Amino acid sequence: NNVNNPTTPREFKGKAFAPVIPSFQYAYNKGRWSLQAGFALTGGGGKCTFDDGLGSFEKIVAETALAACQLAGAVDQVAAQYGVPAVFTSDKSFGKEGKYSYNSYMHGRQYYYGLSLGAAYKFSDNFSAFAGVRGVYASTNYYGYVENIKVGAMPLYMVLDPTKETAANIELSCDQSGVGFTPIIGVDFKTGKWNFAAKYEFKTRIRLKNKSVNQVPSIGNLPDNLRNAYIAGGVPEAAANAIIGNPVIQGAMGQLKTQFDAKLEEAIGEYADGKKIAGDIPAYLALGVGYSPVNAVRVNVGFHWFDDKHATSYNNRQEKLDRGTLEYNAGVEVDVNKKITLSTGWQNTNYGLSDEYMDDKSFVVGSNSAAVGGVYHINKKMDLNVAYFHTFYQHKKTSEKVQLSANQSINYKSDYTRNNNVFAVGLDINF
């Protein structure tokens, strides 16, 4: 019953644009040793804006509108016993149909900066091993709001605090930061035309500290404001007190407050000021096999496993996953001539998603990615790399039934997906 957007299903589209995501790698080789360092957004990063807010924000408004109309009906029914005409279910107030309107917006930014240091040692011409550590600094920001909420023809602030037009607004403004460390080990074995490699990154424990300035409505003043509205409309004070003090009305208002507070906690409780939030990076296993049938051709296949089930997140959300993430990839690289190398690759990503895990504030879906790339060998010391890949995301559909009262419920259906294009440029320099 969104009067500003009555179409169903409704689309909530987020736009992300990252023009530059830099990374640097450095290796110093001497004898059997290789000292290595790198800087990159290893734990993920980017910005996304939802100009019309999120579906979970509208869910709060929609359920509040229905609950408000139920309360209005109960109040007017009790008021009739005292000869007071229906006020709150009239078309000039909440009405009876649960219609609502609101304005909303959401913007998120997340960067996990990683600085890696490590060393590799060549035990023989065929076998080498690596050990290192990555320091991770996490920095995130979330800003969003739900404002100008109206149920029927009644601005919601009028029954929360008539003197303050922003009394019903929900506003989120949160900065998060945290630090973690990732131990890394790896091995590499070469024999003839074959190359076998494995790497394991241990789980990175990160606790994000919130610094927030949030605003949430309070329904605690609802009884007094309804009572004052009656008196301002000419209803005797004794009758107004009797109507609002009726046990049925008191119970309905208590239930409304409990449900509203629970919805707010679910939506933005994670971002309360001063909280420390778990934001672990999962352990990661990578296995790879390379084969070169001729000197100019190299074929690679790989497997990745992310132990998401044991990477702690807010309210142990990771426990809702069926399993960790599995990735399979393959690629071919061909030296066309002394100056040009071309390549192509594919990757399948499969998450262990469940309906309960999905959340529009942060979600992933399975995908297939295809890429093409090339290297221009400028000279013996410099190579210019370019690449493009597109990710074909799957759809994850969920359904949920929310019981608002003994005789009223809402069924929600959601369809999550994404779209992604990446262009990359790199420069290799051999000193």
Predicted regions and their residues:
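Surface-exposed strand-loop-strand hairpins of Gram-negative outer-membrane beta-barrel proteins
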Residues: 1-17
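Outer-membrane beta-barrel porins/channels
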Residues: 21, 27-431
